Amino acid sequence: MIDINSSSSSSSSNNNNSNNNNNNNNNNNSNVFEINSSIKPYFTCIVFVISLIFICSSKNIVTKHLPIGRAGSSIIGATLMVYFGIIQPKEIGSVINWDTIILLMSMMMLSNYMEQANIWGMASKILLWKCKSTSIFMVRVCLISSIMSSILTNDTVCVTLTPIVISACKSTNLTFFPFLMAIATSANIGSSALPVGNPQNMIIATAGGLNFFNFFKVSIVSSILGVCLNTILLLLYFKKDLKNLNSNFNQLIETVNPKVEEIDNNHHDDDGANNQSKNEKEMENINKEVEEEQHNNDDDDDDGFNENKNNNNNGGHAILLVASSMDSIDLSDCSIINKDKKKKENFIEIYFNSKEKSIETIVNIIKLIFKFRVAIILTLVLIGFFIGMHMGFTVLFGVSILMICERKDITDIINSVDWELLLFFSGLFVLVEGFDRQFEKEAWTILEPFVPIDSTHLNVLKIFIFSILILVLCNILGNVPLVLSLSPRLLEALAPDFTWILLAFVSTVAGNLTLVGSVANLIVAEKSKSYHEIGFLEYLKFGVPSTILVILIGVPIVVLIGK
């Protein structure tokens, strides 16, 4: 006899074995290469440190022999983390912060549309328009750099504004270094005002779930004061250089200002000519109406004169008086009717004319909206931020509207996106996550005592030490890697909003400490190397006092407003 139970059990065991084999195969596929758990921390530390050396180094012996760039270093490090089982391949989708990637990509697209709308052309005119001294020129550079950085990210502003300022300095024989420092330092401080000002702010806002308006109301005050203080320090530090106002600078201003004024005058003349033509047309219409009324009155008088003449030729005075009175009444009624008809005709004509004018006005408004579509979309995007809409997709929605309005192939827009930067951040998310999984306890154990988490009982010493640690670590590890490392721990600790905003402010301003502290600094140095090569110590002499003073003033404001 055949034992059914044994056969069923054997079949079930076979199924279990096959399932286990499938699971093992799946695990082998997901874990590309599994290394020993005891080796993982050492391997992770080596990969992370070497990757950071390549990422943070601008030009040294290592990068000269292997110039793979930041994106290459990030991707190689992330690949090693995944290939050797530190992070599973199926986890990559959850490790990468897609909100930040989408926000970065969409802001780059919007920035390209703003460049097409000649926003930077207007900025260059503002820089030199009626500029009477180099000090005023310095202040304008600081203001434009900081304001534009809060909206378009500091990296984008440094890429675009640096050639404009270099061209102005070259034409006027001004020294380059003071104004290059103004671009870099003002861009970093100004970018701290909004969550879209720089990549680390975007990461903090998306990871911490911060409300745009709450971030803005806390950071805007410290950012404005920081920009003002930094501008004053620039004017004092470069006082001797700014005094060298030469004749070439005045000559340039004299040649630039008349062109701007000529454009304004032409614009006003065109408006005046249009207004004058409109007034002449209105006067002609009024004169025609007056002539028609006089002509009608003359016709009425002629009719009355003929009637009286006919009445005098008839006999019977009483009958003639009655008849003449009756005729005069009838004729007056007819004249009233004729006038009413003409009034109705004039009313209809005026109605249709006003209707045509209203249609013309609507068309002009539509044309005006289309002309300033980029500025309108930018304003609506900022409004969307303030009311709490998703930042990345809000910008992408605005960009989509501009794509429809342009009705052009978007190849140029796609090419304007810095895909290398997006790949760099994607790899960095994976790289930092791998390091964080192996050393989260050790790193957090060192930092946790100094992290201001309790918003009800503020410890001044703890806030001070936390700010100093962030300042130093940002210039060693980089602001973005540090923010990525701290974000998961702050989420677990349920850190209040002011802790996140404090991290955003200090990590952003910390970029002004050294030349390699911020990507924006490196961009300015790279763009200006043909005219002035910024030295590390040369930058450090101004960067250290400026950064420390801005943090000393800005941190208390962030804590007091944000708590």
Swiss-Prot record:
Annotated S-S bridges: none
Membrane topology listed for this record: Multi-pass membrane protein
Keyword terms of this UniProt record: Cell membrane, Coiled coil, Membrane, Transmembrane, Transmembrane helix, Transport
GO MF entry, a single one: ATPase-coupled arsenite transmembrane transporter activity
Parts forming coiled coils: 273-303
GO terms under cellular component: membrane; plasma membrane
Compositionally biased spans, kind Basic and acidic residues: 262-271
Subcellular localization(s) per the UniProt record: Cell membrane
Entry's transmembrane regions: 35-55, 67-87, 91-111, 176-196, 218-238, 376-396, 413-433, 463-483, 500-520, 542-562
Chain segments carrying region Disordered: 1-26, 262-284
InterPro entries per the UniProt record, alphabetical: Arsenical_pump_ArsB, Cit_transptr-like_dom
CDD domains to which the protein is assigned, alphabetical: YbiR_permease
Similarity field: Belongs to the CitM (TC 2.A.11) transporter family.
Protein name: Putative transporter arsB
Organism ancestry: Eukaryota, Amoebozoa, Evosea, Eumycetozoa, Dictyostelia
Gene that this sequence comes from: arsB
